[in-house]
Amino acid sequence: SEQADALLMAWYPGARGGDAVAETILGRNNPAGRLPITIPRAEGQIPVYYNKKRPANHDYTDLTAAPLYPFGYGLSYSTFEYGSLEARQSGDNVLEVSCRIRNTSDREGDEVVQLYISDMVASTVRPPRQLGGFRRIRLAPGEQRQVSFTLGDEALALIDPQGRRGIGLRTHEDDAEDQQPGQRQKNRHGPNLTFCKKLSHMQRLFTYRPAKAGTYHCAPPESSRRR
């Protein structure tokens, strides 16, 4: 990344891979692939993966701790603009998260919209970020489209120390992005998955209460209750 503007990874492209690579380099094909792995900057960073917590200011003396290419990273000949992220309840145990995407370039292209879920506070230890879903869409120059994600119990549930799956008391945050490392539009959710829009203050939108029979609610730790 310090020596070139772009790097084309063809992986195992098959018998016609040479033609595909040539068409991409010549601009006849507009790529939109995203990395399914994280590429470390140095071997000392291994293991490195997208949902691993990296403490603030935890850099090496002569090297940043950020990976060379993070999970979900990718380039395109087109550019895209993200609108506001919206969340609403659709039914008793289904959440709809949507964002408007616009092609701001003069070329038709595909965009991979990625939704990441973060737990700000939870009753059990959670990864700092989890991929909640992704959509690949094709947009003409100037075209815009609303992209929606549906999140249910399966996407939002916790696993407790006994291996049970359920909805716990927690604070959520959603990111809609074109690639994993940056942060674009966000929505926050609070205890019982109370959805809020991130403004100058926390504005309550609705409270998510699962209706599925047998769904339990994890109790927060003692330290959380004392606060």
Language model feature labels by segment:
Residues 219-226:
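Short, intrinsically disordered C-terminal tails of secreted or membrane-associated proteins
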Residues 152-176:
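Terminal connector regions
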Residues 175-189:
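Short, charge-rich patches within N-terminal targeting peptides
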Residues 1-110, 116-120, 176:
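Secreted, periplasmic, or luminal enzymes acting at the cell surface/secretory milieu
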Residues 108-115, 127, 159-161:
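Short, hydrophobic/aromatic beta-strand segments
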Residues 91, 141, 168-169:
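Surface-exposed loops/turns
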Residues 123-159:
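Intrinsically disordered, low-complexity Pro/Gly/Ser/Thr-rich segments with frequent PxxP/GP/PP motifs
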